[in-house]
């Protein structure tokens, strides 16, 4: 099937076909190899990219900046306190200003509607670096990471996400698996599962791609026979601290610990996390939670023993953010 990614937005993978997603992952693998071999060619010379961050970031910002620099592009970082966006100037007006100056715009913030408004009015490609609803650049990195470690085609890969299924990772992984014909399972408490409308759409995509979709309230059922187990933090950026009290009791059965890894029944199973991870009490947040919940001192959504084991490939994921973001920029702007 013919397709053209030139000047395309990346708002969520819902707007990309199976073939387009596979192409981006393949291009990322090629660009990664070229960087490792020292043969990378800068294809974005003379391009300028604006990076709008309404949420703090380590991996996304670094990945976009390094990817752009490697390809010869220039970036301007607009942080939460460094512009008039949303305070003195609407996103619609901001889009029309930046679109006159930049060849592409990245946005990391809260509402999906904001990045979609940005795309509607900017007149240049817009890339979603994360919203509360979707995290498409992370999905491309996860797809590349799973392909590297599984050493088999996507349609033979089984993976599970356990935790809060309503957040951007749970929702995005469900979409990714359905689009790529994978066997995807979401293990989450009934009150924290993806909304029925999204599940139904993903089941339709899975039917077209040959994939499988399972949403279950049993972590053990979700991870049975999988190749990969994904998780994310239990309280996301922007949510009140009080959320911990209601989440801990509900989500503790979905913690990735030695017992849950064993329940997969696959000695080669890998554990994935988009980071940052609360796998001990060495962070300010981890220490604060451990004061109230001592049983979580050695990890919240994933335990220290699992995170520091050979099964955990979270840092391969982190590196692949840069390679896959580079693929998005090259495919759209080169």
From Swiss-Prot:
Residue numbers binding L-ornithine: 168, 232, 236-237
Reactions catalysed: carbamoyl phosphate + L-ornithine = L-citrulline + phosphate + H(+)
One of the protein's GO biological processes: L-arginine biosynthetic process
EC number(s) per entry: 2.1.3.3
PROSITE patterns from the UniProt entry: CARBAMOYLTRANSFERASE
Keywords: Amino-acid biosynthesis, Arginine biosynthesis, Cytoplasm, Transferase
GO cellular component assignments: cytoplasm
Keyword Amino-acid biosynthesis: yes
Molecular function, one GO term: ornithine carbamoyltransferase activity
Coiled coil: none
Pfam families per the UniProt record, alphabetical: OTCace (PF00185), OTCace_N (PF02729)
Compartments where located: Cytoplasm
Chief location category: cytoplasm
Binding site for carbamoyl phosphate: 57-60, 108, 135-138, 274-275, 321
Gene3D superfamilies tied to this protein: Aspartate/ornithine carbamoyltransferase
Keyword Transmembrane helix: no
Pathway(s) the chain acts in: Amino-acid biosynthesis; L-arginine biosynthesis; L-arginine from L-ornithine and carbamoyl phosphate: step 1/3
Annotated family: Belongs to the aspartate/ornithine carbamoyltransferase superfamily. OTCase family.
Biological role: Reversibly catalyzes the transfer of the carbamoyl group from carbamoyl phosphate (CP) to the N(epsilon) atom of ornithine (ORN) to produce L-citrulline.
Protein name: Ornithine carbamoyltransferase
